[in-house]
Amino acid sequence: DINEQVLNMLGTLRKARDYCMAANEKFYLTVDTGADTYTLTYKDTKDPLNLPGESSNVFTLPNYFDITASDVGTDLEFNILGEPTATKTITINTDERTINIVSPTGYIYAE
């Protein structure tokens, strides 16, 4: 279900932001629209961020969940306060849903 996957992605992004805030580390998000994946890294060295309960820092989305547009690009930085450097949008299935990342608050939500 597309809504369940959107909620899963929101939860993962929020968990990564909060985890890095607690660890006093920067967090980086990369979105690959061609592969329909997103990748989490952290620290200035951009080490893989494997969240508790996850086996990888790369998340591959199911075939019905297509990232059709994203201005996140490579290594969107969230500072140690969880604030992204810019407001960004991830579009799912050509305007079916969008995930918004708001600067400077770090608020992450879906429409």
PLM features: residue spans?
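N-terminal helix-rich module
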Residues: D1-R14, D18, A22, K26-E111
